[in-house]
Amino acid sequence: MAEGAASREAPAPLDVAGGEDDPRAGADAASGDAPPPALGGRMRDRRSGVALPGAAGVPADSEAGLLEAARATPRRSSIIKDPSNQKCGGRKKTVSFSSMPSEKKISSAHDCISFMQAGCELKKVRPNSRIYNRFFTLDTDLQALRWEPSKKDLEKAKLDISAIKEIRLGKNTETFRNNGLADQICEDCAFSILHGENYESLDLVANSADVANIWVSGLRYLVSRSKQPLDFIEGNQNTPRFMWLKTVFEAADVDGNGIMLEDTSVELIKQLNPTLKESKIRLKFKEIQKSKEKLTTRVTEEEFCEAFCELCTRPEVYFLLVQISKNKEYLDANDLMLFLEAEQGVTHITEDMCLDIIRRYELSEDGRQKGFLAIDGFTQYLLSPECDIFDPEQKKVAQDMTQPLSHYYINASHNTYLIEDQFRGPADINGYVRALKMGCRSIELDVSDGPDNEPILCNRNNMAMHLSFRSVLEVINKFAFVASEYPLILCLGNHCSLPQQKVMAQQMKKVFGEKLYTEAPLSSESYLPSPEKLKNMIIVKGKKLPSESDLLEGEVTDEDEEAEMSRRMSGDYNGEQKHIWLCRELSDLVSICKSVQHRDFELSMKTQNYWEMCSFSETEASRIANEYPEDFVNYNKKFLSRVYPSAMRIDSSNLNPQDFWNCGCQIVAMNFQTPGPMMDLHTGWFLQNGGCGYVLRPSIMRDEVSYFSANTKGIVPGVSPLVLHIKIISGQNFPKPKGACAKGDVIDPYVCVEIHGIPADCCEQRTKTVQQNSDNPIFDETFEFQVNLPELTMVRFVILDDDYIGDEFIGQYTIPFECLQPGYRHVPLRSFVGDIMEHVTLFVHIAITNRSGGGKPQKRSLSVRMGKKVREYTMLRNIGLKTIDDIFKIAVHPLREAIDMRENMQNAIVSVKELCGLPPIASLKQCLLTLSSRLITSDSTPSVSLVMKDCFPYLEPLGAIPDVQKRMLAAYDLMIQESRVLIEMADTVQEKIVQCQKAGMEFHEELHNLGAKEGLKGRKLNKAIESFAWNITVLKGQGDLLKNAKNEAVENIKQIQLACLSCGLSKGPGGGSEAKGKRSLEAIEEKESSEENGKL
């Protein structure tokens, strides 16, 4: 290799237009917009196959000739590529059987090598921000990488494979991180080749993520097998996958002729991969046979294997498998364990657990016996429920259910009795069945006088279709606790006369019996009972007569939502509240959900009882949320509030529930009969916590003293922002939009990722469109979202057709942020009406990282950021009351210490990741693997030794080491040191913060009086109260963040130590380090069972 081949090429001036050395800079040069070339530079129609000799006198392309040829040909275990099909040039015009897209998929290392030998254009990035177009090829002898044009002679414009130390995917070198054009370069199209003793980098950008993956996979394969004979690439036919397919074919070939009917072959492939369409399999066989200039209804073994591999190999999964298997074409138990720990975030995984996964998902008997997982089994595993994006812990009740009812969001239905629009839609009892089965915990009963003294439920715009009140009660009683055992709230809309009200009360008592919760609320309490205490109880929400009155009936205000809106629209509304008569029997069924009218927050906080609740129309709630967001949140800490859709929504469309959840409103009633984006949000939100219909609100909305505004457009005090990294990799089996008018099944899909939450978090990103591909469109695009309040955030994936006529919707999936699982996950897509679509998925990678401070996610390297940015600290506010301000001033220094310790540890970890060439989303396990690969010499002995100092794992060199390794060790030592400082100091600093918080809280009750004594009133007093709540929120939040950071640091140290042991960095002179490391691990842990120690 020429000295400095990758870093000393003289660039052409930037203003040169064209020519051999034309540097192309900017987004157009590197963003990946250009379509990828056909793989390996092959012709679009090229296919490979077995050349069979024909029998005498029988045409070889006839079925008889094919059968004779197969009998005359010895059974082959290899697929021989037909050289005639490799020729470039024109073909006769003929009918095309090519499937879309027609480029051959990558399904093996051989395909990658062939592509690299054919060559393609890559963009070469220099540290001086210049970008050059170069044509890169791999030598036919597989020994060197070459590029042209170049001002150097041919022998210098090359890179020997033997000099390559490492291949990195993504923008993970200093050239990319600090390059002024880095933001315009697609992350998934970039890769770097590190070579030479000093780890110089050759930084490249492909025109698509697919092409980048081919080069990375191919180069890694070559580097890992550089000592093997040159003909090792030709052994594809001997891979476990081909041997398994051969066995499958032979088992189905009952005649032993090496040929099967096409119908049998199609059925066999469908058995192996049920997601494939029959038409697609038949088209693939025709395509393969057409490339051999024969059409027949019989399939050879080779054609069967080729068809299966091309149809069932997902390139993105193949590239992943090669990456994590250390360039093999299968995973063993150790590979799988590393994948689960480092990528999927699985803890406490063992080799036996990995072998069990292999036994359950590997398709070949040989693989199950030998303990390896090939591409097809790995694909099935990734598609299994074990790799679902939804956290399995949230599929059961996982939250504290002992808090007051007002501390939960409650799954609520509006106009439950309707299954169509509210203008003319008939009443249907199935509305209640569906809602209750979906976990709804608040349903509406709009009751009117019926014939024969029997109350009824009906749409008052369509009285002909009605339900008897009793039949509805019986259905509710039957399904009330099928989906959830937690309390069900019946929102009673009473439009009945006094006689029929008595019938209502009698029927409810008779049907529900002891399930009815009628206990009088205790005046000694301040909050509602908990869902846990109210299990299997039915609570009636409605009007109530004064308890001190002995009257058997009386007047109460009417809360007929639809009637009031009609009066407003007709101009009959004069501001006066309508009244109705209420009987004592029905009144006595109302206990802890007494309906009252809302006037203003100040009056409510003084006079409203905790068992009283208000209902707000959508219009009124929106006005309050905009004008008094903080007051609305504070009100909802103690009292239940219900928001219902505007009566103007005659089509039963839905409001956006997120707008009111942001204000803390617990019961946001939805029209379950109307699907769409708003109902998707509602359904997705209540999937968490076991789908029980109750979701605990964020602590900042529950704490008695806290500051939170529903309209915040910045960071939330006391909450550390997180960064969500989502890579949209591919889609599987996308259907045509149901309402589309276009002919054919061709679609042009793209993906939108929506973030829903507080205003500061709401945003949307979309991928590029993939043309004419519904089966396995590859997107390979990564997005970053800063999330300021994770507990109130949802992620919605939407797949749309860019070339639609009539309808663009393909599918969607909505999931709470807290339920996301990290790693490679399949998203099960739902239809427009919310049903799971079989075999229709989106393949993604999820990672969540910490983000210090506010603003957009940073894209520059840590060294650049540290040099340009002064650290920002969360500030406490001045209240204007000296006694209290003096207490909060004591907390300023501990707060700075807490923030410094957390950020210093995070920065040290990021620095190690950068030096290892890994992105911020990488795990520490991945860092240690990369680190060990550089610190272990060619004879498998480490150049460093693991040394435990006071229970912390340090690495000490065993002799002279290169500067590159010195820098990595220095970064590693700093990470350990900063973690140690945090672990040892966190408790002391947190205690100081907690003491300041407690001292401040002692003034909470007297804050109004103290303010009045100091002359604060009106706006100034409100500002002082707001600042007080801000400071308490900051102190509590920072204390919690510090505690969590310490726990994270302790866990990191354990993982680092285990990784050092498993990577072989403990093998120092004289041995013994490994045992010492294991003993030290026990000292770090606070509590650990003997069983867990045994596993370690």
Curated annotation (Swiss-Prot):
Feature: compositional bias, Acidic residues:
550-563
The listed locations are: Cytoplasm
- Biased composition of type Basic and acidic residues is found at 1075-1096
SMART domains noted in UniProt: C2, PH, PLCXc, PLCYc
Q: Region Interaction with PPP1C: start and end of each range?
A: 83-222
Q: Which residues form a coiled coil?
A: 1040-1060
Post-translational changes noted in the entry: Phosphorylated by the catalytic subunit of PKA. Phosphorylation of Thr-94 resulted in dissociation of PPP1C from PRIP1.
Where would I find the PI-PLC Y-box domain in this sequence? 586-702
Q: What is the effect of changing S96A?
A: Decreased level of phosphorylation. Loss of phosphorylation
Annotated signal peptide: none
Which Pfam families would you find in this protein's record? C2, EF-hand_like, PH_12, PI-PLC-X, PI-PLC-Y
Q: Which residues carry this modification: Phosphoserine?
A: S48, S78, S96, S570, S1080
Report the residue ranges that make up the PH domain in this protein: 114-224
Annotated stretches, region: Interaction with GABA A beta subunit: 544-568
Cite the record's note on assembly: Interacts with PPP2CA, Ins(1,4,5)P3, Ins(1,4,5,6)P4 GABARAP, GABA receptor beta subunits, GABA receptor gamma-2 subunits and PPP1C. May form a ternary complex with GABA receptor beta subunit and GABARAP. The formation of a ternary complex with GABA receptor beta subunit and GABARAP could be the key step for facilitating the association of GABARAP with the GABA receptor gamma-2 subunit and to allow it to be transported at the right destination.
The protein's name is Inactive phospholipase C-like protein 1
Q: Which gene encodes it?
A: Plcl1
